[in-house]
Curated annotation (Swiss-Prot):
Species per Swiss-Prot/TrEMBL record: Saccharomyces cerevisiae (strain ATCC 204508 / S288c)
Other observations noted: Partially overlaps SEC6.
Protein name according to UniProt: Putative uncharacterized protein YIL068W-A
Amino acid sequence: MLYVISELFFFLVYRYCFSNSNTNRLIKVGSRSTPLASMLRRYSCNISVACCTIFFLSELLTSFLHFNIPTSKSMRESQYTSRYFCQISNMLSIGSQLRSMKNSITVKFCVISVSLLSLPSSTLTKS
């Protein structure tokens, strides 16, 4: 049930990011464009993809390779939390980058990483 609610929430965030009136509002700082806002607009997708790739690879290592790492409840919860945080950050960065980089490889990689991170945890972990 929690998974369905979270996926519904991420779908709403996704729709919010891709609506035309809200695309530039996500990373706008104040009423005018600042150097920080332009830097975030330029590099937010790359940063979020790098972070999410690290989290996703760590989740794959602990679930598939079985390095005798004790998977405590807190470790599993932190993996799920980081994965959901990656979904939100990737969707926000895709929404902010979509107008300026429609055919870019970076946006395509963001879409692929969001798709991978959206997989249910049962497909990523062996029971």
